Amino acid sequence: MAEKEPDVRRRVPAAAGSGTVRRGDVARDGRGTLNDYPLVPSGSAVDEVRADIIDRLVHAWQARLTLSVSPAALMIAFYDWGMHLGNAPGKQAALVEKAARKWVRWLTYLSRVAINPGTPPCIEPLPQDKRFVDDVWQQLPFCAIYQAFLLQQQWWYNATTGIRGVAPRHERTVAFAMRQILDVFSPSNFLATNPEVLWQTFSEGGYNLFRGVRHFIEDWERAIAGRKPIGTEAFQAGLNVATTPGKVVYRNELIELIQYVPSTTTVHPEPVLIVPAWIMKYYILDLSPENSLVRYLVGKGFTVFMISWRNPTAELRDLSMEDYRRLGVLKALDAINAICPNRPVHACGYCLGGTLLTIAAAAMARDQDDRLKTITLLAAETEFSEAGELTLFLGASQVAYLEDTMWEQGYLDTRQMSGAFQLLRSNDLIWSQGVRQYLKGERVPMTDLMAWNADATRMPYRMHSEYLRRLFIANELAEGQYEVEGHPIALSDIRAPIFMVATLTDHVAPWRSVYKLHLLTDAPIDFVLTSGGHNAGIVSEPGHPGRSYQIASRPAGGRYVDPETWSAITPVVDGSWWPAWVGWLAEHSAAPGKAPGMAAPNAGFPSLADAPGYYVLEP
């Protein structure tokens, strides 16, 4: 008989980030309100509590107007930058000189290109900037316009960086903010200054603009109604994505555990447990049949289990990181041990799921729990001191602002989360898409990966607050200060072999940050650096064009090699990294034999539903 799970919905923990317990912290509908504290004693205590609630409600209201960006964090950063720049006459003089040189440089280019249209540009865009690659940008007056924009962009970068005394975090924030402002006013974003759009408008008689207006209205109506982007209806979990055959063999208040049907006559005895991130739905690893990592593993003779996380509502606001470890990873392992008894498990975690798996593995190592045969981490961070531009949104002020937003809602909404990720690549994900769809009138063809990306989830208030404060801000996991069941864990306790994958252009988990696990454990590590980004680099099936990777092994207790040296000396291999991982799993597995049965009803784990289950279908 499966163990009945405790009801976590009604617990009232310490308010996230405050360290104090407040009665009535959760309203009947899971939302925080001014009337949530009727039982607090009168006097100064109630005054403090009510003042705190008023502040939180005001911040939550402000967040709707500022896209959840803390105005205080921006003001502090700009104040730091402005004060130090104002007290740096040498820097000011250098900036004036740079401006004069750029002005002369632009005028010289303008005079030459007027005589010789083939004159090389006076400044080239960055390699990742694809806004001005079309040949029509090399014609007057558009070449002069975009060259002036690039020179101005370069000058502002010089103006916001390299000022003595400015806190590095504030410098990055100001530079990032100025880049966002400049991107808004890029000549590629406007009809009158974008020659590609102008020529298309002339050739189509303006019909492209008509289509663009129609697209904008369609998208606006869907956004207001909270519906997914147009085209996502073509990809439905269980119909044409997440179609690998399987059964839900365990369910609790937080997860469904899926066991996939074997497709080979024999399988390796060690099962594979995949712990995906709960920031999105699990089926990124089981997309279409041709690019499903799950189907690929099953086809190579492995018994695969997948955690499917529930999409939390306001009622589940008090779920904690410990709940995700206990009700997620540990309960899944218990079920797998019942279905595949006496067999160690290959555990694989993706993104946030990999971080959680590392926490669970360190706690298991501390407690001498040896159920993990190997650990695979896909684009997963364990050390957060250099976690990339995402940390710009995660200072103390910004996290407090997010906490107040989540306190009022009970969770972090999908749109609030996706907005931060889009800003990290605003050129590609916001402005270029806007130009294509609303000025050129072209719909971006929907793909399975894009549809999955639109199928976002919510993050519970307490869990997300703990994740941001304890991991991103305090870096407790890497510092040996993260506690599980009241005692600290250390990644150095992990002895199981580790296979680690990072992606070259990852803006969520930068590969150098992922690489830092080499400093935190002496376990043997096989490290893979693959082409692509956070998602596309992982969904990299064999035969995918343009894929390549680097791979090297560090034995247990081997010497440390810094990431730059590692990248320089490790050869590049063409193709997908999937076969290398499957080969590594096979090396750490026993010889194939008879497949285990589906589920274990006699042990309390019957088949509950067909894959993909119910939780993945929840809105």
Residue locations for each model-derived region?
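Amphipathic, low-complexity, repeat-rich surface-exposed segments
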Residues: 2-258, 262, 267-269, 280, ...
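Alpha/beta-hydrolase-fold enzymes
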Residues: 152, 156, 160-213, 217, ...
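Short amphipathic alpha-helix adjacent to the substrate-entry channel of hydrolases
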Residues: 286-304
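Alpha/beta-hydrolase active-site loop
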Residues: 316-340
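Gly/Ala-rich beta-loop-alpha elbow adjacent to hydrolase catalytic centers
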Residues: 349-353, 357
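Catalytic histidine neighborhood in serine/cysteine hydrolases
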Residues: 468, 517, 522-559
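Short beta-strand/loop motif that positions the catalytic acidic residue
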Residues: 500-502, 506
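Conserved alpha/beta-hydrolase "acid-adjacent" motif
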Residues: 507-513
